Amino acid sequence: MQIQKVASDQMPPPSGEPSPELAHILRAHADAYMQNHPVGSQQGKIFRDIRHCRTPSLGVHLETCGIGCGYERVSFHSCRNRHCPKCQSLQKARWLLERSQKLLPTTYFHVVVTLPHELNPLILRNRERLYNLLFEAASKGLSELATGWKRLGAQPGFTAILHTWSQELRFHVHLHMVVTAGGLSLEGDRWIPAKNDFLVPVRALAKMVRGKFLDGLQWLFEQGQLTFSGNIAGWRNPVVFKRLARKLRRMKWVVYAEPPFSGPRHVFSYLGHYTHRVAISNQRLVAFDGQTVTFRARNNEQPGSYRRVDLPALEFIRRFLLHVLPKGFIRIRHFGLMASRNVQTKLEQARRLLQASPPTTQTRPTKDHRITWQQLLLKLTGIDPT
């Protein structure tokens, strides 16, 4: 892999060449990849869907002018696969339209919980179980710390979004959580705001997440519900597994919280940035010469700048497949006040309390929930579906 730093994210393809897309890469190399690597039915379907998305092979529909001017426009059908970078804008717009009606008029924190890379070999063989375990450990840890901690002592509401990739498409499992800066009192009679831009102590949260995750991992091991194969086949030995667990308990797990957003409008925009993102968007692809894929990645050493990453096409496809979600897996989940069982009760009570009280409310809910999804799609993405 070669990495070249550049000063900005504006890295167009060479003059005269079309912008590369994931579909172009898969059309050129997916068959060769499948000949040399085991590919399941779900991965094969992803290859087919993305390669044929918005092409004549999926069919077309004809749009005509309703007042008889004779104008016609042919549009190719989309594949609607959740892993297709072309098919996320509409899903995102619809989701944001629905969520905008449930946001509370308060500030929000962004909390990120990351799993140690030492777990990657085990996660790759047990994706669904361990992704679920991460959601459980993070949500319970945050909820218990918020409700029991003396400086808050309230139930917050939060949305958690699973991402599995780094900027270079490596396997990097982490949760993004958008959390209300405060919560409903345990008695349900008042809103308790977070004090001094401080939600909960992140070190304590990291320890709680670590403990809950490793306790759950131990239970899965004892129940024989973990798969061990290939170069981790030896991990099924209780002595070896215990050694791994002990090592993980001694490690500092990465959890951080960013300063709060200024209100629902900002968190609405932020959620749109993270929710329906796939591992690689077409906008990040810079060049494809038939053999090498070049894409841009953030340069953490120089904030605001980007670097070029060059990968052989087959390695690029391998990394892309690392981030295929289990079939039917729910990667966006809601907890606390945002949980479905609380939406009609505790969430509405919190909304009434916030709208009745002064300065803790930064802004009223936006008017975005009153526009159509077509208007919202245009606002968020610049795509006009009409």
Predicted stretch roles:
Residues M1-T386:
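Beta->alpha loop/short-helix hinge microenvironment recognizer with preference
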